[in-house]
Amino acid sequence: EAVFHAISLARRNHVAVAFDLDYREDTWDTVEEASLYLSLAAEKADLVLGTRDEFDVMEHLLHTGNQDDAKSAAWLLEKGVSVVSIKKGKKGSHVFTKEGKTVGGIYPAQVLKTFGAGDSYSSAFLFGLLHNMELKDSLRYAAAASSITISGHSCSDSMPTLEQVEDYIAHHEYVLPDTP
């Protein structure tokens, strides 16, 4: 209820709503309950981010078995969502807008742990959008931030600064996935 109240307040005050699905199985009674509430919140957002697995949970009731990123994005775009970002780990990301699909790449890195990668991605991606960067540049920032985070030993200590992200972009190779 608090989430829906916050979304309503944001809407009334012309504040954009970014919704990160951030599904954690142990916080829900059933996948059906998670699917219902995640989809209700997502369709009220301006921007929705999540992993492919999180989109699968959200779509459990609406589009059972769907694995098609474009279909996952289409129903949200039809509801008025402006940006849909599907994080795919080492396969990059797919971002959908009404203008079409943009494929985000990765900065290959030595993985010490994966936790925190999604938070780094989301925060850097949103930073780029809030600073009026091109979508492709926001995706580079997101990929760099994720790579820095997974290369560190702890989650919070590995969260990069803006300077670290920009240095990483300048000195590392950005790789687009073979199959978009």
Segments from the language model and where they lie:
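Conserved beta-alpha-beta core of the PfkB/ribokinase-like small-molecule kinase fold
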Residues: 1-71, 91-92
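Conserved phosphate-binding/catalytic region of the ribokinase-like
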Residues: 8-12, 60-180
